[in-house]
Amino acid sequence: MVKVVPLRFITYDPLKDPSKMIYRRPISKPVKAFKGFFSEFLGTLYLVYFCGGSVCAAFAVAGDSAARALLGGLIQGMALAALIWAVSGVSGCNLNPAVTLANLLSGRVGLIDSLYYVAAQILGCIAGAGILYGCLPNMYRIDLGVPHLAPGMNTGQAFLMEMMLTSILCLCVLGTSVFNVWDRRLNRIAPFAIGLALFIGVAIGFNFSGGALNPVRVLGPSIISGVWSHHWVYWLGPIVGAILAAFIYRCLLQERFDVIERPGYIAPLIDPSTAVSSY
C-alpha cells in the first residue's frame, strides 16, 4: 500500500539511503497547464498589489524623491524575489509579458505556454489592482501607482529608459533561471539576482519614466483607476527591451551544451508502482 503523507512531513534524505530515490510523480498536460496558468495569475496578482502599493506607500510618507525611489525599488525587488521562490517551480514565475517574450525567443517556453501565461498575467494584474483599490482610502490611492513621466521628459526618452531597464532585467532572468536547466545551484541565487535587477531598474526610473519594467504592472492599475497617460510607452519599451535581451543572450552570451552518453552507464528504469511512500 502506498502511504500518502502531507508535504510538511517530507524529511527523507536520499544521501543517507542510496537504495532509494525521490521520484516526481507525473501529471497530465491539462493539470500542468492549469497549474501554470494559476501560478502566473496568482504571482502577477501579488506582484501588482505589491508594486502599486509600494508607490502609494512611498508617496504617503514624508521624504524626498530619492528616498521614495529607493523605498519603491526595495519593496518591488524584494516582492519579486519572494514570489519567484514561492511559485517558480510551476511556471517559472514570469509575471511579466516582457519576461515571457524573452523566454519565448530564447527557446525556454513554447508559443502556446507563452500565450496563456500572458493571459493569466493580464487577469492577475486586474485582480491585484482591484484588491489594492479596495485596501486603500481615496487619499492614498495615488492612481494605484500608475507611473507618470517627469516634467520635461518626453515619450521618446521614457521609451528608451523603459527599454534599457527592462533589457537588463530580462538578461538577468535569462542568465540565471534559464541556465538552471544545467546548474541547479543557481536556483538559490536566481530570485535574489532578479529581484536586485528590478530594484536597480525601479530606483533609476522611479523619478523619470516611473520605472515600470512590466506592461501589466501598469495595465491593471490603469484599468481600475482610469489613468492612461502615455500608456503605450510601458508596453513598447519593455517589449523592445525583451527582444534586445533575448537577441544578446542567444547570439552572444548563451553557452552551448551537448548531451552525450556516459560510457558503460545504464540509466535505471523507474516504476512508480514500487514506491514505498508518496508525498
UniProtKB/Swiss-Prot annotation:
<feature type="topological domain" description="Extracellular">
    <location>
        <begin position="210"/>
        <end position="227"/>
    </location>
</feature>
<dbReference type="InterPro" id="IPR023271">
    <property type="entry name" value="Aquaporin-like"/>
</dbReference>
<dbReference type="InterPro" id="IPR034294">
    <property type="entry name" value="Aquaporin_transptr"/>
</dbReference>
<keyword id="KW-0813">Transport</keyword>
<feature type="transmembrane region" description="Helical">
    <location>
        <begin position="189"/>
        <end position="209"/>
    </location>
</feature>
<dbReference type="GO" id="GO:0006833">
    <property type="term" value="P:water transport"/>
</dbReference>
<feature type="topological domain" description="Cytoplasmic">
    <location>
        <begin position="249"/>
        <end position="279"/>
    </location>
</feature>
<dbReference type="Pfam" id="PF00230">
    <property type="entry name" value="MIP"/>
</dbReference>
<dbReference type="InterPro" id="IPR000425">
    <property type="entry name" value="MIP"/>
</dbReference>
<keyword id="KW-1133">Transmembrane helix</keyword>
<dbReference type="GO" id="GO:0006971">
    <property type="term" value="P:hypotonic response"/>
</dbReference>
<feature type="short sequence motif" description="NPA 2">
    <location>
        <begin position="214"/>
        <end position="216"/>
    </location>
</feature>
<dbReference type="GO" id="GO:0005886">
    <property type="term" value="C:plasma membrane"/>
</dbReference>
<dbReference type="GO" id="GO:0015250">
    <property type="term" value="F:water channel activity"/>
</dbReference>
<protein>
    <recommendedName>
        <fullName>Aquaporin A</fullName>
    </recommendedName>
</protein>
<feature type="topological domain" description="Cytoplasmic">
    <location>
        <begin position="180"/>
        <end position="188"/>
    </location>
</feature>
<comment type="similarity">
    <text>Belongs to the MIP/aquaporin (TC 1.A.8) family.</text>
</comment>
<keyword id="KW-1003">Cell membrane</keyword>
<dbReference type="InterPro" id="IPR022357">
    <property type="entry name" value="MIP_CS"/>
</dbReference>
<keyword id="KW-0472">Membrane</keyword>
<feature type="short sequence motif" description="NPA 1">
    <location>
        <begin position="96"/>
        <end position="98"/>
    </location>
</feature>
<feature type="topological domain" description="Extracellular">
    <location>
        <begin position="136"/>
        <end position="158"/>
    </location>
</feature>
<keyword id="KW-0677">Repeat</keyword>
<feature type="topological domain" description="Extracellular">
    <location>
        <begin position="62"/>
        <end position="69"/>
    </location>
</feature>
<feature type="transmembrane region" description="Helical">
    <location>
        <begin position="115"/>
        <end position="135"/>
    </location>
</feature>
<feature type="topological domain" description="Cytoplasmic">
    <location>
        <begin position="1"/>
        <end position="40"/>
    </location>
</feature>
<feature type="transmembrane region" description="Helical">
    <location>
        <begin position="70"/>
        <end position="90"/>
    </location>
</feature>
<feature type="transmembrane region" description="Helical">
    <location>
        <begin position="41"/>
        <end position="61"/>
    </location>
</feature>
<feature type="transmembrane region" description="Helical">
    <location>
        <begin position="159"/>
        <end position="179"/>
    </location>
</feature>
<keyword id="KW-0812">Transmembrane</keyword>
<comment type="function">
    <text>May form a water-specific channel. Required for prolonged spore survival on fruiting bodies.</text>
</comment>
<feature type="transmembrane region" description="Helical">
    <location>
        <begin position="228"/>
        <end position="248"/>
    </location>
</feature>
<feature type="topological domain" description="Cytoplasmic">
    <location>
        <begin position="91"/>
        <end position="114"/>
    </location>
</feature>
